[in-house]
Amino acid sequence: MMQFDRMALGRQAKELGFVRDTFEKVCRLADVLKFFEGDDLLSEYLALKGGTAINLTILDLPRLSVDIDLDFSKNMPREEMLEVREMLSSRISKYMEANGYRLSPKSKNHHALDSFVYEYQNAGGMKDNLKIEINYMLRCHVLPVVRRKVYLPWMTDELSVLSVDPIEIFGAKIVALLTRTATRDLYDVHNMITHELFDESQLDMLRKCVVFYSAIGGEHPPKEFAIENVGKVTKRSITTDLYPVLRHGERFELTAVQNEVRTYLSGFLNPTKEEQIFWSAFEKGIYEPQFVFEGAELQRIKEHPMALWKCRSKEQNIKTEPVKGRVR
């Protein structure tokens, strides 16, 4: 466990251009990831995703990301998963408590998700928290999970973590942008574009991931992509949600970024007829992933727990005969 000295943190944060307290949170987050990687169970069963994976393993820390979002990484029967889940929770709890964190009442445990909120007193003497979320229903992935290096300029020791594939991470990130229209999502997707992370040959798979996660992630699959929602990000949210995690002096030109992102997404987010059939069937409670994927990708997600659960729920709501998770 690294020591969090107020003066040292202040100097380092100033050198890097970040807010000290937010910088401290990322240092703590990195410490937790280091513990995960050194644990035989946590390192194999938990895959990093979301903004933290983007900014710590794909890009070179363009912004700070302050939550640890994870997927259970192995597809296994529910009973086996629950046994492993209990062991994972126990190991995380013991580590966090031994290092001065206290589990907050804001923590939640659902059948699909564990959301652990751990409170601590930061180096400035203020109360703060670190959130660790583990999704157990997203334990199937379109692409194989990969081990990636963590890029943090202040770390001397090499660190790598198990991670969801970058294409799949950004597929889910684009879905988040088009549905919750958060400033940080817009920032991350814009960085995907400006850093040219994916070439033309990868855009087809990126679109398929957006199609897939737009179906299983919401109450209803879309009929088309709501790219116009990019325009709903507000200037106020830049000040409140984005600037606190950026380097001092960095400016975010909202209108220009919105136009660039809209143009880029419009260029490849055009669902095929087959993908529209997938959406239509999913809305009726029928899981037909073969209209989106084939080969190894199809095999990996054909028994996707979240997709099957969503379809069973839809079937029950419309009082139709249940379909037992088959690929036809």
Enumerate the language-model features and the residues they cover.
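Structured mid-to-C-terminal alpha-helical surface segments
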Residues: 1-46, 56-62, 66-68, 72-328
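Active-site glycine-centered loops adjacent to acidic/histidine catalytic or metal-binding residues
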Residues: 51
